[in-house]
């Protein structure tokens, strides 16, 4: 259920864009992201920092898109969010306080160097996605960027999540691997 809620704003953005335009879709994205926060809090009685940061970015860049009637702001939002994720992961790793380990370390007992590999992998992934977003957003038609944002980045994130799970599984202690089978 939680993962479905994460996709709600993206689905609404895409649908509204297809029926209207980027400006109405940007307004719908702000509203859908706010709704996501309300529903998530109502169901789980807590909000994750990632959701709050995303909501803040969506609100700021969506509002700028609407006020200035310029889709460049909503396009930059994607890159800035990915840059913030890469920065947060990278800094946490440099401080030996891996965010990924703190999120998943209780369920997956792997060595610190494995968490470091996974963290730097995701730092690289987010940085590359942010750069590719800039290229697609400002070199290709708007329709292409919307499809890339909704389908391309989502697919890439899911693929990288699966790769990460397999990598972590490979490095789990044998007794923990047996528990997961």
Curated annotation (Swiss-Prot):
Disulfide bonds: none annotated. GO terms for cellular component: plasma membrane. It is a multi-pass membrane protein. Pfam families: IspA. Keywords: Cell inner membrane, Cell membrane, Membrane, Transmembrane, Transmembrane helix. It comes from the Bacteria. The chain crosses the membrane at residues 10-30, 50-70, 72-92, 118-138, 148-168. It is found in: Cell inner membrane. Plays a role in cell envelope biogenesis, maintenance of cell envelope integrity and membrane homeostasis. PANTHER family: INNER MEMBRANE-SPANNING PROTEIN YCIB (PTHR36917:SF1), INTRACELLULAR SEPTATION PROTEIN A-RELATED (PTHR36917). Belongs to the YciB family. This is Inner membrane-spanning protein YciB. It comes from Shewanella oneidensis (strain ATCC 700550 / JCM 31522 / CIP 106686 / LMG 19005 / NCIMB 14063 / MR-1). The lineage of its organism: Bacteria, Pseudomonadati, Pseudomonadota, Gammaproteobacteria, Alteromonadales.
């Amino acid at each position: 259920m939680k993962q479905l809620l994460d996709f709600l704003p993206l689905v609404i953005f895409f649908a509204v864009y297809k029926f209207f335009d980027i400006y109405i879709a940007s307004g719908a994205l702000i509203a859908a992201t706010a709704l996501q926060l309300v529903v998530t809090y109502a169901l789980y009685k807590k909000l994750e920092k990632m959701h709050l940061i995303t909501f803040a970015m969506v609100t700021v860049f969506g509002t700028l898109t609407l006020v200035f009637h310029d889709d460049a702001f909503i396009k930059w939002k994607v890159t800035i969010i990915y840059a913030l994720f890469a920065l947060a992961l990278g800094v946490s790793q440099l401080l030996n306080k891996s965010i990924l380990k703190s999120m998943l370390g209780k369920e997956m007992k792997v060595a610190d160097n494995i968490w470091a590999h996974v963290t730097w992998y995701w730092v690289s992934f987010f940085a590359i996605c942010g750069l590719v977003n800039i290229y697609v957003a400002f070199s290709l038609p708007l329709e292409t960027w919307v499809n890339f944002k909704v389908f391309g980045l989502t697919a890439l994130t899911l693929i990288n999540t699966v790769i990460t799970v397999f990598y972590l599984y490979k490095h789990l202690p044998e007794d923990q691997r047996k528990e997961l089978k």
